[in-house]
Every structure is written in C-alpha cells, then in structure tokens.
C-alpha cells in the first residue's frame, strides 16, 4: 500500500512500462531494467548500478487498466508525505534516513571502514508500530 497523505495535488506521478511477467503492488520500489522497463528493486539499493528508484502508486496486479496497458504509476517527486505498509522488519524513528532494500523501505546505514553508506531516498516522518505504517518524505 502507498498513500499520498499530503501534497497530492503537487505530486509528480508518472506512468512507466513494466517488464513482462513482473507483478508490482503499491508500495513496492522499482528501478529501470536495461531495456527501460520497470522491475522490482532487489538486494541492497545501489544508486550507481541500479539508478533511480520510485515507489509504486498504482499497480499492475489489481489495477486492470494498468495491467492491460502494460504500465504502472510511480511517485517521482514533490509528493509531500507518503505512507506505506511495505518496509523492512525494523523499528523506525522520526527523522531517520531511509534507503531501499529488496524493494521495500529500510533504515539507511552510515559508512564504515569496509562498507559505503547506503543511499538516502527519504526520511521517516512518523512510525506507527501497532498499525504497521511508516510515513515518510522523499529526499
């Protein structure tokens, strides 16, 4: 699930073609494949090798029009506050930096001697553990 809580009138929602056979649901995070179609992001997000990433707003599983047209709608910018139930099994704190891992929100990590910092895609606004919802803003 992905909701636009504020900024809906200014949100930049774009429609892109998805790779045949790929099922994308609201709240999944996608990247472009080598042929220019969208696929679900996998592994630790790497901006250099995977390029830009977007959250899916309108899917191709239950949204018949999108499935028939071969497209999904993603939020690309100016979205205000977004809310999702698709995130890693961790506790979120408002203000903390977010990244993407295996197609869902996760906490960003700082650089260490042996690893680089994870790319920051946004920040936590609110976390409701009881409802299993994270509100966030894109970077």
Protein language model regions, located:
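Surface-exposed, low-hydrophobicity beta-strand/loop segments enriched in small/polar/acidic residues
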Residues: 1-139
